[in-house]
Amino acid sequence: MTLTKETRVTLNDGNMMPILGLGTYAAPDVPKSLAEEAVKTAIDVGYRHIDCAFITGNEMHIGNGIRSKISDGTVKREDIFYTGKLWCTYFSPDMVRKGLERSLRDVGMDYLDLFLMHWPVSLKPSGASDPSDKDKPFIYDNVDLCATWEALEARKDAGLVRSLGVSNFNRRQLERILNKPGLKYKPVCNQVECHVYLNQNKLHSYCKSKDIVLVTYSVLGSHRDRNWVDLSLPVLLDDPILNKIAAKYNRTSAEVAMRFILQKGIVVLAKSFTPARIKQNLGVFEFELKPEDMKTLESLDRNLHYGPFREVKQHPEYPFHDEY
């Protein structure tokens, strides 16, 4: 199938997700206004899939960017596929609605196209919220993931969410949701870190067998925010083999890294706040990697997580103790 910026995948609930989206995470020291301008640029050049999260603290700015492009007639609300995420401190069933409504309010929308459980680890709101919060520790909670899922299903029934999914779940955790008695809605996707150094082949195969779309963040090897990433890890885009293949196609290493994942049938979220790069990333639809180059890139897998969220490694639901 020829891939274009208009290509969408059909989710198991019948809704459609664009195969390329704009990731909007930014380190705390990055001005929030840049997110708003990035969204405007992305929509202007053809992106229709915008991914955000409560924990990034910029949903209000993302929403401003989207609404400005709706106001000027560039797009209609129904043209945009917007993803939000329920943070781990809102997993208690009685908190799910509050978490969703906060995101809806901040982004200025009546509904979200997709809402994800951000990580499978529940945290108490009295503790730290994310790794940048150095003043207090994380306090683990023991909320049943299935109970959170049931509360999310109720929000979908209420019309506040079009599709439901998960993020950073392993196979065992997905199976618990899928095997839940009385399940109303399957997760439509599992959003995970995935790139040349972490190809996620086993998890991808499992998700495909269950009609769950794999969506990838950190496709370029992650940002270099020391709150989340070990800065001693190798820089993916500097990989000599990746760069050799990029030169062969007269493309950037970033374009090849993204095209590799797209050709595997995985939805890509490309994070950039630089207008030129946002536009350049659409170049992934202008070429196709040959089978031998796909095979070479597959061989670079190191099972390397740039963002393993080690601060919650002792949580009983920490996902990366399992093989996949």
UniProtKB/Swiss-Prot annotation:
<dbReference type="Pfam" id="PF00248">
    <property type="entry name" value="Aldo_ket_red"/>
</dbReference>
<dbReference type="InterPro" id="IPR036812">
    <property type="entry name" value="NADP_OxRdtase_dom_sf"/>
</dbReference>
<keyword id="KW-0007">Acetylation</keyword>
<dbReference type="InterPro" id="IPR020471">
    <property type="entry name" value="AKR"/>
</dbReference>
<dbReference type="GO" id="GO:0016491">
    <property type="term" value="F:oxidoreductase activity"/>
</dbReference>
<keyword id="KW-0273">Eye lens protein</keyword>
<feature type="binding site">
    <location>
        <begin position="218"/>
        <end position="281"/>
    </location>
    <ligand>
        <name>NADP(+)</name>
    </ligand>
</feature>
<comment type="similarity">
    <text>Belongs to the aldo/keto reductase family.</text>
</comment>
<dbReference type="InterPro" id="IPR044482">
    <property type="entry name" value="AKR1C"/>
</dbReference>
<feature type="modified residue" description="N-acetylthreonine">
    <location>
        <position position="2"/>
    </location>
</feature>
<dbReference type="InterPro" id="IPR018170">
    <property type="entry name" value="Aldo/ket_reductase_CS"/>
</dbReference>
<comment type="subunit">
    <text>Monomer.</text>
</comment>
<dbReference type="InterPro" id="IPR023210">
    <property type="entry name" value="NADP_OxRdtase_dom"/>
</dbReference>
<protein>
    <recommendedName>
        <fullName>Rho crystallin</fullName>
    </recommendedName>
</protein>
<dbReference type="GO" id="GO:0005212">
    <property type="term" value="F:structural constituent of eye lens"/>
</dbReference>
